């Protein structure tokens, strides 16, 4: 994949450094320092900010990816294209600010009417959604600008590492009573503000970016096309941005903020599944956009198949490692008995994240094709289905209902989307190479069942402290099955890129 692979690898390294920090923060510091209802509150505030910030973009991120090839001109600093990416979201945020204060009462009532534990906290801190939304908005916009210039590493580092390190610091200050809970909420606002500032400075350092808009470059036809596209993307974003958050909102509103905290931990565990796609997808989108702009369907099809295959390999292996160690993870967590309530939600959410990250490239293809307006139909369908299923299942099955609603909604959505883009565009991300990957993972699950039944009791028994034996057991089986899985991939030659990577790693160890 050339530059796609190189930038993706660097971005993935930054992502997994962030994952390491995030694991310590989320599963050990946060659960130790905060009560479940406080965890639920912070997550709901951040999710509301991400939702409103996403809507305030007015489709800027998608529009930027689609129209940048028309502006791309290094000699003329891209005709001030990046100025548009600042102006449009600012207009959107102004509308959001007005809507927020008009409907704040209804928002507070939704989260407090039926919720039990922790609802009063939301009413107290709801105004902090505004600064968090503003900073989240421009963190995303500046990261998209960097992606367009194929410079994803620093913005990725800021998002995946910087924000997590800052979050860790905030929780430690709260744990040691340097901050009270008010200080925690204010601290998040300061943290996101600093992240936005770093991204601004980085963009200026590239010296390619100009925020001075060249109004004369915008032809009437381009203006009409842009406004028409943006109109659809705004409506699509209204549905698309809501989906990942709906289950969290319903769990908090229809059960309690305490269970929302449990659901947050389950969601954070499952989020590891899609980490590779965050880099792979970010660096692939400009190339897919360029291929679609040139009507190079074959190139777009090759990119989609490659992204889908490599994300499925990475995601399914990570899902396997997470699930075979899930009980051990809950044994390690502070207040683990409380968060163990989310065990099956972890599995359902992990499967949902695997489905989403594997096939999310289909939404990219549709957005950059001449059929982009169909994205509105698909996302409204997804939103409607998700709302209905959450409203039906959360009151019945609590967090498991929310997780199941998430999985079923995405599964149906992507089946329909796969059929559509094959029919209308001629792109099919699915390939036969996915089958051997699925078979390898299923066989590994069978081996794990045998291991757990026969060997785990023997490994744990000699130790006075069971946690020591469980740690050894987790390390042994994870290492063995991971190596076995990679060996199987290598022998079956599922991916030449994976084989080349294994060869390079093997050569390093062999030379030593």
Identify the residue ranges that each predicted region occupies.
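Interhelical loop/hinge segments that connect adjacent transmembrane helices in multipass membrane
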Residues: 1-4, 181-187, 199-244, 287-302, ...
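Signature of the first transmembrane helix
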Residues: 3-62, 92-101, 112, 132, ...
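Membrane-interface junctions at transmembrane-helix termini in multi-pass inner-membrane proteins
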Residues: 5, 135-158, 350-381, 392, ...
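Transmembrane helical elements of multi-pass membrane transporters/channels
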Residues: 7-23, 187-203, 220-290, 310, ...
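Helix-loop junctions and terminal segments of transmembrane helices
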Residues: 57-73, 148, 266-308, 363-368
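Interfacial segments at transmembrane-helix termini and the short loops linking adjacent helices
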Residues: 106-129, 323-353, 460-468
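Hydrophobic alpha-helical transmembrane segments
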Residues: 157-173, 177-207, 380-387, 399-420, ...
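Membrane-proximal transmembrane or re-entrant/amphipathic helices at the cytosolic face
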Residues: 450-512
């Amino acid at each position: 994949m050339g530059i796609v692979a190189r930038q993706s690898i660097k971005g993935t390294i930054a992502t997994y450094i962030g994952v390491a920090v995030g694991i310590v923060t989320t599963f050990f510091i946060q659960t130790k320092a905060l009560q479940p209802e406080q965890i639920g509150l912070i997550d709901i505030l951040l999710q509301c900010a991400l939702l409103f910030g996403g809507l305030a973009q007015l489709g800027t991120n998608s529009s930027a990816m689609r129209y940048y090839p028309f502006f791309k001109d290094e000699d003329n600093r891209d005709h001030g294209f990046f100025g548009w990416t600042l102006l449009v979201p600012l207009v959107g945020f102004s509308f959001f600010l007005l809507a927020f204060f008009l409907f704040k009462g209804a928002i507070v009532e939704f989260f407090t009417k039926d919720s039990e534990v922790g609802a009063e906290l939301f009413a107290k801190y709801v105004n902090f959604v505004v600064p968090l939304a503003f900073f989240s908005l421009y963190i995303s916009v500046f990261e998209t600008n960097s992606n367009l210039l194929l410079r994803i590493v620093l913005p990725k580092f800021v998002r995946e590492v910087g924000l997590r390190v800052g979050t860790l610091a905030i929780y430690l200050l709260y744990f040691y009573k340097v901050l009270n809970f008010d200080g925690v909420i204010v601290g998040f606002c300061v943290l996101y503000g600093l992240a936005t500032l770093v991204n601004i400075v980085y963009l200026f350092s590239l010296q390619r970016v100009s925020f001075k808009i060249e109004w004369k470059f915008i032809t009437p036809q381009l203006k009409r096309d842009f406004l028409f596209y943006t109109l659809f993307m705004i409506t699509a974003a209204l549905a698309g941005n809501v989906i990942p958050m709906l289950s969290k909102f319903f769990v908090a509103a229809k059960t309690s903020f305490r269970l929302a905290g449990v659901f947050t931990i389950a969601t954070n565990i499952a989020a590891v599944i899609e980490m590779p796609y965050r880099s792979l997808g970010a660096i692939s989108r400009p190339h897919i956009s360029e291929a679609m702009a040139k009507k190079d369907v074959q190139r777009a099809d090759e990119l989609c198949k490659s992204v889908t295959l490599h994300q499925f390999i990475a995601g399914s292996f990570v899902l396997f490692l997470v699930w075979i160690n899930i009980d051990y993870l809950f044994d390690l967590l502070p207040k683990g008995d409380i968060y163990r309530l989310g065990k099956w939600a972890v599995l359902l959410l992990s499967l949902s994240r695997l489905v989403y990250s594997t096939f999310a490239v289909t939404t990219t293809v549709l957005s950059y094709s001449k059929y982009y307006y169909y994205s509105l139909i698909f996302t409204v369908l997804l939103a409607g289905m998700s709302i209905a299923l959450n409203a039906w299942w959360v009151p019945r099955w609590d967090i498991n209902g929310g997780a199941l609603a998430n999985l079923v909604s995405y599964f149906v959505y992507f089946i329909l989307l796969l059929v559509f883009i094959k029919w209308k565009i001629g792109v099919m991300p699915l390939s036969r190479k996915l089958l051997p990957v699925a078979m390898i993972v299923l066989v590994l699950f069978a081996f794990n069942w045998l291991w757990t039944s026969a060997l785990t009791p023997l490994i744990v028994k000699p130790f006075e402290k069971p946690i020591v034996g469980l740690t050894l057991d987790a390390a042994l089986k994870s290492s063995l099955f991971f190596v076995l899985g990679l060996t199987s991939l290598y022998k079956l030659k599922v991916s030449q890129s994976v084989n080349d990577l294994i060869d390079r790693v093997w050569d390093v160890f062999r030379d030593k």
